[in-house]
Regions:
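Bacterial N-terminal signal peptides
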Residues: 37-47
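Catalytic Zn2+-binding segment of zinc metalloproteases
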Residues: 340-356
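N-terminal prosegments of processed precursors
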Residues: 51-139
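Active-site-proximal segments of metallohydrolase catalytic domains
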Residues: 243-319
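Short pre-active-site segment immediately N-terminal to the catalytic Zn-binding motif
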Residues: 219, 316-339
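Fold-level signature of zinc-dependent metallopeptidase catalytic domains
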Residues: 177-235, 248-258
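Extended acidic/polar, glycine-enriched regions
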Residues: 132-199
């Protein structure tokens, strides 16, 4: 293996020598007197600490195309300022999540050194009507532990049947003179919101503020701490709080707030977040990947949340890219957790009555997302082990009544936006709907039980969700059992 020197020697399971040594010593010490155990523990800790983490390498590239074709080109290769924050014993991703998947392979031996699944803005954009009429280019990045010898970057994408197809390969030589090793100054002070341990053994979650002026930096920190508390009051994050480090970065903005083009508001914010992504007034994204990476590289991170300093309802979340939320909205708590579910665990949207920019799927294939199914074979349902024997598949619920009420609600919501009514009126409508839906779902025969409830992934028919209610479906405050398990699986991939 060709990572930095301390990680070259591994066992057959891919465990680096220091970690393997520590495990063997620990197993042996269980049989030793306490004094000897204590001495050997000190030696083990000291020896393990002597091995430094590799550097963090980032491949910035351009992703160009239309709904039917796509091209890739290298932008630059960067060595980020901080060491690799991840666990080198968990370099390989076996979760099979994401629309895309990349591998870092030793060019000589073809051994896979690192891999991760992910989704992208391009992957969403190519399903919109705009992608049928024109081409666009998006900046994207892949981050991985810096190798010491040439590697191949292999990128795969799911085809229409959800099989992986190789779509791009490029070679990186870490000794190339054009690898950018410049030391860039941080644009913001790193705030340790919650530090539970070494980044290599924890999930590292970075919260970035956008649209906060220099006078509002204390507000950012208060917002970040408030929403962090919300996340860790929600299961299963609550039970795994000690597995997370949380960091904050907030470069000062020249003006307060972020862009909202549909209302004529434009801001040159540090990270470039904006409402109206893909023409959806509530969808908040940044298309400026360079700006995001310039800020983020000064913190140890695997996951990013961008807090937009705005009141208007909105947010977004893309698996293994980032999530966003309008920090001042009355439903920021819900949006923060919901969108982080997308970003962190690849959870699908389970709702289907709200308007979206994406075109409907031409055929029903089994989704890669862990909380949605096409139910092509009920006996092979991916969460079948959580279904009680007396729960029918598909699982009945008052779908027609829900859809009738939801149509009326969406009409009222659209009128509030069209009339440019105050955000407080929209929040009042959301509270009214939340109260109504909560009572309706709790009255369901199969409430709180895992089954297969039709209606998910923006489609009324053909896709099914695990429970009648979940934070990925409505504005409730909890994840369903299937989503909780999916989240815990990702926590395990990044912590120990």
């Amino acid at each position: 293996m060709r990572w930095a020197a301390p990680f070259r020697k591994v066992n057959a399971y891919g465990i680096p020598a220091p970690t393997l040594c520590a495990k063997l010593v620990f197993d042996y010490c269980l049989r030793m007197p306490k004094t000897i155990l204590f001495i050997l523990a000190l030696i083990t800790v000291s020896a393990t600490a002597a091995f430094a983490a590799p550097q963090t390498m980032r491949l910035d590239y351009y992703h160009t195309g239309t709904a039917s074709q796509e091209l890739f080109s290298v932008d630059r290769v960067v060595i980020e300022p901080l060491p690799w924050p991840g666990d080198m014993t968990k370099a390989i991703d076996y979760t099979n999540l994401g629309k895309y998947f990349f591998e870092v392979r030793d060019q000589k031996t073809k051994q896979v050194l690192y891999s991760r699944g992910f989704a992208s803005i391009y992957g969403e954009w190519e399903t919109t009507d705009e992608a049928k009429a024109m081409s666009r280019t998006f900046s994207e990045s892949l981050r991985f532990p810096a190798p010491t010898a040439p590697v191949e970057i292999v990128l795969r994408k799911r085809d229409a049947k959800n099989f992986w197809v190789e779509i791009w390969t490029t070679v990186i030589d870490p000794k190339d003179m054009f690898v950018d090793r410049s030391k860039q100054s941080a644009s913001a002070r790193l705030i340790p919101i919650q530090k539970m341990g070494d980044p290599a053994t924890k999930v590292d979650f970075l919260i970035i503020g956008d649209g906060y002026t220099a006078r509002e930096l204390k507000k950012f920190e208060a917002d970040a701490r408030r929403l962090t508390q919300v996340l860790f009051k929600t299961s299963p994050f609550k039970e795994h709080r000690r597995d997370f480090n949380v960091w904050g970065l907030c470069p000062a903005a020249g003006e307060s707030g972020i862009s909202r083009p549909s209302t004529g508001i434009y801001r040159d914010s540090p990270v470039g977040t904006t409402y109206d992504a893909f023409g959806s007034e509530r969808y908040v994204l940044t298309f400026d990947n360079h700006a995001l990476r310039r800020v983020a590289q000064h913190a140890p991170y695997e996951f990013i949340e961008v807090l937009a300093n705005n009141r208007t309802y909105g947010g977004g979340g893309i698996f293994n890219l980032y999530s966003t939320v309008a920090a001042d909205n009355g439903f920021a708590n819900y949006v923060f957790v919901h969108e982080f579910g997308h970003h962190f665990a690849g959870l699908a949207d389970e709702y289907y009555t709200s308007p979206v920019a994406y075109a409907a799927a031409a055929e029903r294939t089994e989704p890669w997302e862990p909380n949605a199914t096409a139910l092509l074979d009920p006996q092979a349902l991916k969460w079948k082990d959580l279904v009680k024997p007396d729960t029918p598949l598909p699982t009945p619920w008052n779908k027609a009544v829900y859809e009738r009420d939801s149509r009326a609600y969406q009409k009222r919501r659209g009128q509030l936006r069209a009339d440019k009514r105050p955000e407080s009126e929209m929040e009042a409508l959301f509270r009214e709907v939340q109260t109504h839906e909560d009572a309706m779902f709790r009255a369901e025969k199969y409430f709180g039980r895992v089954g297969a409830f039709e209606g998910a992934m923006y489609e009324a028919k053909g896709y099914y969700r695990p429970e009648v209610d979940c934070i990925m479906f409505s504005r409730t405050d909890h994840f369903c059992a299937v989503c909780r398990r999916a989240i815990e699986r990702i926590i395990g991939l990044y912590s120990h």
